[in-house]
């Protein structure tokens, strides 16, 4: 029989802990346990065990867990379709909230503001993600676009992919954002070359590249602040 969380000391149970101390006091695995709700009798895993396995499978990256499909989630023994559907629903709701949050921001005024917006989303990712913020003539947010996923190079991050949506949305400027899975935001020579290439392409198209911000683990690097752009 699956060892139930109900049998645990009350101060260790996720639900009781949240009610007493607030949701922020829970670990990622404990929060997932509340979404998963029950353990699995066949495997003897508790809901927290399943939550921990999910986090481990995706390298502690909530972004990559959130983008996983049902087949990837149910690959874990004990994670049936109902549990996987609950996890997908929670991440989809969080993604929609994140989008609303972006819409509610009047404008980006500093590199720090960009970092504050993106670092929780990107800091634990095992892969590099390259995103573009589209801005109007008053630096107000139009939307965000993901350009690539995986190792950055000039063949993947092509001006065509970066500026295609900018042209469609009549954007006046863009801010480039990507993460370094190592946690060190120091730009590589490839990063610098890509940025210069995109800036030159933007100048030809009349779309300004305002900054390129690299997200690290608790820190960031702004090409403008560093004097690279």
From Swiss-Prot:
GO BP term (any one): proteolysis
InterPro entries cross-referenced by the UniProt entry: MPN, RadC_JAB, UPF0758, UPF0758_N
Residues that hold Zn(2+) according to the record: 178, 180, 191
Chain ranges of the MPN domain: 107-229
A GO MF label: metal ion binding
Record keywords, A-Z: Hydrolase, Metal-binding, Metalloprotease, Protease, Zinc
Intervals of motif JAMM motif: 178-191
CDD domains: MPN_DUF2466
Composition skew (Basic and acidic residues), residue ranges: 7-19
Keyword Transferase among UniProt keywords: no
Metal-binding keyword on record: yes
Pfam families according to UniProt: RadC, UPF0758_N
Region feature Disordered, mapped onto this chain: 1-20
Family to which this protein belongs: Belongs to the UPF0758 family.
Protein name stated in the entry: UPF0758 protein Ppro_3582
